[in-house]
Amino acid sequence: MTRQVALDKVRNIGIMAHIDAGKTTTTERILYYTGRLHRMGEVHDGGATMDWMEQEKERGITITSAATTCFWSPKYGNYKGENHRINIIDTPGHVDFTVEVERSLRVLDGAVALFCAVGGVEPQSETVWRQANKYGVPRIAYINKMDRTGADFFDTIKAIRERLNSNPVPLQIPIGEGEIYAGFVDLIRMKGIIFDKEDGSTYEEVEIPHDLENEARTWRINMLEAVSEVDETLLEKYLNGEDITESEVRKVLRQATLNVDIIPVLCGSSFKNKGVQFMLDAVVDYLASPLDDGEVEGHHPRTEEDVVRHPSDDEPFAALAFKIATDPFVGKLTFFRVYSGMLKAGSYVLNSITGKKERVGRVLQMHSNKREDLDAVYAGDIAAAVGLKEVRTGDTLCDEASPVVLEKMVFPEPVIQIAIEPKTKVDSDKLGVSLAKLAEEDPTFRVKTDDETGQTLIAGMGELHLEILVDRLRREFKVEANVGQPQVAYRETIRSKVDFEGKFVRQSGGKGQFGLVNITVEPLEEGKGYEFVDAVKGGVIPREYIPAVNAGIQEAMKDGVVAGYPMQDIKVTLFDGKYHDVDSSEMAFKIAGSIGFKGGARKANPVLLEPIMKVEVVTPEEYLGDVMGDLSGRRGHIEGMGQRAGAQFVGAKVPLSAMFGYSTDLRSMTQGRANYSMEFESYREVPKNIAETLQEKRSSKDAQ
């Protein structure tokens, strides 16, 4: 059994963009040109192949990262005529589904960043760009919708440079914009490409139009200067006025793209079939193969020693599970990226996070929601496994004889929660199982039971996120449920450092209970969560009781001292204590830890925190005053404003608690002509009057 395509001919790419930049349409065109589709689906008629969930077809947005495989042989460039395998992950553009983008980027070798030629760089573009920077993902930019009225290629380039702090280098410039968009000038070959008006998939190569000759020369010089800066040999040739070959330019462009020194920029109109073929050539030419990415580092699950895996079929098997999905026909699907080795269908793998062995029943190559069986997968492949029951997102799958734990994925905490109740007894029986399956698929979706009311609470990244999950309950799991009003996920923290003694003594005949701890409680910087330091010396507390102290503290943190909300960003140092030979126990020290923490937290200037959202509103100018006044009335802090795509935009930081129902209010305020995006920014201290209201609510709840 050998691989079909050499590793250097594989490209694992993501398509990332703001909502409505034309992402799903572009993927459809890629599949059409690479021979995977016979009829192209349009997003606006609900027929797109990659948008396969019912809600996606209805809303015209992509929610889950559908994965698909296709093949492409470039017509131009250094890989001309060589067949390449392209694995594509289509990622959602709505900020509530940022987790899908995050986990896709973790396993990709490159990305195509889509921008709308009219809208330019929009808020989600910035979010996704930051995520791609975090993982060092090489990318090319494709400026789509060049045929739309108001399209501005060069303005979008400027926005990429300024708003994304990147180095965009156009490899093409458009011939016409808006309704007169006809094609582009290829700055590497210095030729014009004119697309057929009726069928954009056919085109002819022409000389550069006279009125564009000077502009094309200027932008070619700009491109040559940019690539020369990253290669000394090329720089020398350029400064000496020597000829630089097309092959040399592409070779250096590739290296500079892989190093994320430059972002090659292309243009087109996917809807009109113009430009996608050349974007595919660029994917092959400039984006990384698994070999370019090189080795991945991890550690041994038992010894914690560093372990390295190279992208080779001969190395031991190592893969990362990056997505769990429920398929109506085959059950649980585990999407994984193979970093080294090979895996045959029917063989066993070790989950190095849980230490459990599981059998991979089938290995599938996915085409959106269709599938084909594979006998084996190899280094660099992206596939889906059937039969893995206990694997979760971010787990490492590996060879039992050579275990490794790859770097885990980190997901943001949910910021909004709602109570959910089944409508009937039948629904009640199914609700728990169905919610557990959804939580397994989505690491930012949490389910818990309120200890006091017994209500089931679901938490997620935004109103749309939870709305779609409740919708999936109804459609996929046939569970009808009522949902309550959204609740904000408040948090608590401390502002001061204090020492405190926690003591638990119980003497009631027979064996007593005794545990005494001395701890320091102090604030940590935002986002650090919780840190426990064992600074006990001289055996004043036996070693076996110290984990119990830590457990008691963590349990106490779940129920804060201000209004009962979870506490975060706190460091606790255990520095002293006492024990009793007979009466001490793990339970006694757990309770002592809890008492000590609660007492210390009350003295350490505790405060209530609320999630603050980064909000951007794009509105016609006549409504600007109303929009700004409304945001200020919601305790919003206006941070910036300006013009974008013929409209005004306002940036603000607003508490989440003030944003519920905002879409309806904005619609009525602007007659439906404005839109907005919102994403979590950080936690901030709640104003005193609101904190008091929340404390009163808590007190009245406790009194009931």
Curated annotation (Swiss-Prot):
Give an example GO cellular component term for this record.
Answer: cytoplasm
What name does this protein carry?
Elongation factor G
Q: Which family does it belong to?
A: Belongs to the TRAFAC class translation factor GTPase superfamily. Classic translation factor GTPase family. EF-G/EF-2 subfamily.
Q: Principal place where this protein is found? A: cytoplasm
Which keywords does UniProt give here? Cytoplasm, Elongation factor, GTP-binding, Nucleotide-binding, Protein biosynthesis
Q: Which InterPro entries match?
A: EFG_II (IPR041095), EFG_III (IPR009022), EFG_III/V (IPR035647), EFG_IV (IPR047872), EFG_V (IPR035649), EFG_V-like (IPR000640), EFTu-like_2 (IPR004161), G_TR_CS (IPR031157)
A biological process (GO) of this protein is: ribosome disassembly
Domain of life per record: Bacteria
Lineage of source species: Bacteria, Pseudomonadati, Chlorobiota, Chlorobiia, Chlorobiales
Compartments, record wording: Cytoplasm
Extract the GO molecular function terms from the UniProt entry.
GTP binding; GTPase activity; translation elongation factor activity
